Amino acid sequence: MALTTEEKKQVLSEYGLHETDTGSPEAQVAMLTKRIVDLTEHLKMHKHDHHSRRGLLLLVGRRRRLLKYVQKVDIERYRSLIERLGLRR
């Protein structure tokens, strides 16, 4: 599911480094997390939507790679990010 402009602005204002930040790893991970949560809710209702399930797996993989990068570059930023997002890693 695509995010609306308002949802994107809300996520970026909370997790971005500045107001117009869309490229930092934190902002990207937060956007992916929002999309993953929305898609997970969709798949709970539409169990046979395998096309969306594959898209979900791709998003999870992309988020995992970005988190691995943040962990490698700055472990404190990584710990702060997963705590703020409520991820299990």
UniProtKB/Swiss-Prot annotation:
<dbReference type="GO" id="GO:0006412">
    <property type="term" value="P:translation"/>
</dbReference>
<comment type="subunit">
    <text>Part of the 30S ribosomal subunit. Forms a bridge to the 50S subunit in the 70S ribosome, contacting the 23S rRNA.</text>
</comment>
<dbReference type="InterPro" id="IPR005290">
    <property type="entry name" value="Ribosomal_uS15_bac-type"/>
</dbReference>
<keyword id="KW-0699">rRNA-binding</keyword>
<comment type="function">
    <text>One of the primary rRNA binding proteins, it binds directly to 16S rRNA where it helps nucleate assembly of the platform of the 30S subunit by binding and bridging several RNA helices of the 16S rRNA.</text>
</comment>
<protein>
    <recommendedName>
        <fullName>Small ribosomal subunit protein uS15</fullName>
    </recommendedName>
</protein>
<feature type="compositionally biased region" description="Basic and acidic residues">
    <location>
        <begin position="1"/>
        <end position="21"/>
    </location>
</feature>
<comment type="function">
    <text>Forms an intersubunit bridge (bridge B4) with the 23S rRNA of the 50S subunit in the ribosome.</text>
</comment>
<comment type="similarity">
    <text>Belongs to the universal ribosomal protein uS15 family.</text>
</comment>
<keyword id="KW-0694">RNA-binding</keyword>
<dbReference type="InterPro" id="IPR009068">
    <property type="entry name" value="uS15_NS1_RNA-bd_sf"/>
</dbReference>
<dbReference type="GO" id="GO:0019843">
    <property type="term" value="F:rRNA binding"/>
</dbReference>
<dbReference type="InterPro" id="IPR000589">
    <property type="entry name" value="Ribosomal_uS15"/>
</dbReference>
<dbReference type="Pfam" id="PF00312">
    <property type="entry name" value="Ribosomal_S15"/>
</dbReference>
<feature type="region of interest" description="Disordered">
    <location>
        <begin position="1"/>
        <end position="24"/>
    </location>
</feature>
<dbReference type="GO" id="GO:0003735">
    <property type="term" value="F:structural constituent of ribosome"/>
</dbReference>
<keyword id="KW-0687">Ribonucleoprotein</keyword>
<dbReference type="GO" id="GO:0022627">
    <property type="term" value="C:cytosolic small ribosomal subunit"/>
</dbReference>
<keyword id="KW-0689">Ribosomal protein</keyword>
